[in-house]
Amino acid sequence: YTLAPFRYHMLRGIDFYRHAQDTLRSLPNVTFLQAPVESVQDGSQHAQVTAGGQTYAAEWVFNSLFRSSEFKITDPRYQDDKQHFTGWEIETETDVFNPQCPTMFDFRTPQHGVMRFVYILPFSPRQALVEYTLFSADLLPPAEYDLALKSYIQDVLKLTHYRIQAEESGVIPMTDQPFPRRTGQRILNIGTIGGRVKPSTGYAFLR
């Protein structure tokens, strides 16, 4: 099956962030500050952010603070599922992958009562991202994601010799609960906390 004239593109978060930061650093009116945010307070004329022991005031604050461990669905009317995943970028000793043919939903992995699948994004005949993904209300112990990946690579891809070049993991809320666009007169939520996760796929930027 061909996607023509469409194409599937993989956008690495780190590449996007570097591009955005390089652009912003070139602007004379932008200053970067890296510090833990201690509080965000709303006001009628301005909002205040306290970070690293200092308080900063602005007419508008764009809030992207989101911690999946603290996100809870308390209203029974809404779904409380999560999309959670671990992926490995692997390199093989022989040609294995077709760079023109990604695998999007491979359900040849034990389901254990919830939807689980693996997708493969090949970069070259010997390099690919192999990602184990599932939808459930509860997360797995970290070792279980690794075990599922090892089993899939061995049993389905028939690979025993490969190198793990990079790893990634994440948790994305998959809920129909409305996300407030504002948390005050002067505070606007963006990113995941602003409800900007694509509902059909879970694709999103955390911040």
Language model features: what each stretch is:
Residues 23-163, 175-180:
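Predominantly flavin-linked oxidoreductase catalytic cores and closely associated redox partners
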